[in-house]
Structures are given as C-alpha cells and as structure tokens.
Regions:
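Polybasic, low-complexity association/targeting segments
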Residues: 1-9
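Domain-scale recognition of functional cores that engage charged ligands
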Residues: 10-57, 62-181
C-alpha cells in the first residue's frame, strides 16, 4: 500500500448496448416488481463515493479573491477582465444558497459599514468570509458537511440526504446499510 493502487485505464465509455442495458417501460416495471419482492431476502447497501474537499467546487472563487483588486476595480470589471463565466452565475443565485443568511449575518458583524457598501463590495466580503479559514473555510471542508438543501424546517447536508435516501430505498427488514468511502 506504500505505492497505492494502480490506476485503471478505461477502454471506452459505457453506452447503451455497450455496457448499459436499456429497458423498455414494461421490462423496467417487471424488474422493479421482482426486486421489491426479493429485497427482504437481500442485504442492501447504499454506496456513497467520497466527494472530498470542496476545493475544486470553490476554485473559481479562490481565483477571484487572489486576482481581484478590491481597492481599484468592481466585480463587473474583474469579470470582464478575466472573462469569468462562473462568478456571474454564482452571484446571480447567491441568495438562494442555504448558507446565505448565516454568512451574510457574519459579514454584517465583521464589516462596520456594511449597510453603506455597494452591492459588489458586499459580494466581495461575502465570498472572502465564506472561504476564510478564520470563519467558514468552505473550500477546505468536505462537501458532505456543507449546507446543501434548504427545507422549510431545516437545512440539510449531503450526509443527511444520503442517510434519508438509504432509509428510503436501501432498507431491507428495517435495516439500512450505508458505505461512505
């Protein structure tokens, strides 16, 4: 194990009739009924591959913080200068993120003149606080523990969602098995 496991090289992608079987509606229903009838005799397990740290997910935001000239340019100027396509999408939906209110609240407590800032300055401080190791450190946390879905009653992480999925479709005889890598 000192050298790890050797890489696997794939010959080609799986496609329908070459590694993937396409079922008709009737075949699908038949196999689904068969599975439901037999699942109490099986030990079902939901397999969840590791997603790792969120560093790749927030890479474009780290690049923004490293390259953005906060004192001399607006975010729009940065977007145009870098031809960044991810940042505008992120900013357009920023208020929909389940973690938005918590981070915004922290930014308000950190930035004394928050209410007098222009929108792009608020966005800069939001991103900086979200990624800062002193506060939320999102880029260095496992994706599985980040706030993921916002429900009326609570905010769920991916780990919680996997547990719910496991209970829903990978349960046999009132027992669920879950394997996280």
């Amino acid at each position: 194990f000192q050298t790890g496991i050797s890489k696997m090289y794939l010959a080609r992608p799986a496609k329908i009739d070459d590694g993937i079987l396409k079922l008709s509606g009737d075949e699908f229903n038949s196999k689904s009924v068969f599975f439901d009838e037999k699942k109490s005799t099986l030990k079902l397990k939901k397999f969840v591959p590791a997603s790792g740290a969120a560093s790749r997910m927030f890479k474009f935001l780290n690049e923004f913080l490293n390259d953005f000239d906060h004192e001399n340019e607006t975010i729009n100027a940065y977007i145009n200068r870098k031809k960044d396509k991810n940042l505008p999408t992120f900013l357009a939906g920023i208020e929909k993120f389940p973690f938005f209110e918590e981070i915004k609240s922290k930014v308000k407590s950190l930035v004394p003149n928050y209410y007098s800032l222009e929108s792009h300055e608020k966005s800069y401080h939001f991103i900086k606080t979200m990624l800062s190791s002193d506060y939320f450190d999102f880029a260095n946390k496992p994706k599985g523990v980040l706030d993921f879905h916002k429900y009326q009653s609570h905010i769920a992480t991916p780990v919680e969602e996997h547990l719910n999925e496991c209970a829903f479709y990978a349960t046999s005889n009132s027992v669920s098995h879950l394997h996280f890598t």
